[in-house]
Amino acid sequence: MTEHVRERKAVRLHLTNIAGLGAVQLIQSLLPNFERLLDYKLEAVYLPSRGELSNYETACHETKLICYKRYLPNSISRLLECTLFGSKFDGTTPLLVLGDIPVRSKTKQTVFVQTPLLAQGASTGRQLGAIKYWIARWLFKLNIGYVSTFIVQTEAMKAALIDTYPEIIGRVHVIAQPAPLWLLESQLKRTQRNIRTDSGLRLFYPAAVYPHKNHRFLRAIQADRANVWPVSELLLTIPENLNPNPAIAWIHCVDRLAPDKVIKAYENADALLFLSLSESFGFPLVEAMWIGLPIICPDLPYARTLCGNQAIYFNPEDLNSLYVAVVNLSERLDSGWWPEWSENLKVIPRNWEEVAAAMLGLATDEGEAA
């Protein structure tokens, strides 16, 4: 009897524009799961020439790794890559672009949009960033016609993208993501506050230095009022020389942390403090929910979509609102309160294999609309 061999669907991955910390960690969780899917094969992976992903090694000998070298400043090189040089990615094998901006290429193209700054009204918090993303939005709109499918992480991001580019209605699909692989493997769970001798809150904000991450919001805390805040430590993952308010003794800047150090920080924290003004998803929110931690975050659509009524919200334009939220958390914890995230986590995939399969299903025309 002849055994039937199932044909594997070929796909190409475009990663040349993946640079941000959160985006890199997301791709590092996805790549091994893409490779493990038996129904698909990675024909080619286009890698950046610098950064962590440039050193990626595939476990599959059939996959061709192609390093995209840049000889011009990144912004100019990206513009050319997505327009005049887009034909480099022509081909009959579907292309899954994991870096936000479509390329002008003759192929079946699916684009995973991670940055919320492509949506109208999103703010970087500074003029230079606004110019950069105005150009990115122009380029995105210019190449929309080359894309079959867009993937986003939340319904809020889907709505924002369609509001900005109405012509893509019907082409946008939502695929949420779980916590990063390294955190899932840690099995860390928190069900109560740690018992300590000090009474202040230990807060953790894991975010790189980008304007929309809003570290500068902490500048408004007055040194002579610092002791009024019920906080013993706020841990920021930014360099000490970028400390937004060195006069506040309980703000500690520890620079970028390796995954094992992030896990340790979550073990010690009483809550996640999230300050970001704009997110397509907000991985730290998912991380904190998965662990079981309380969350203080801005009262913005991206946060409401994920956290529902379990988070403690504040007005991101009002420092006193943040202070009230922190006091509220302190009082709740003192009374024995702890959040219950089980309902919120029901919309989050259980693992990265589900996410990888859903993405490649859409990229090869086998996925269903969200």
Where are these regions (language model features)?
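Active-site donor-binding segments of glycosyltransferases and PAPS-dependent sulfotransferases
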Residues: 24-101, 253
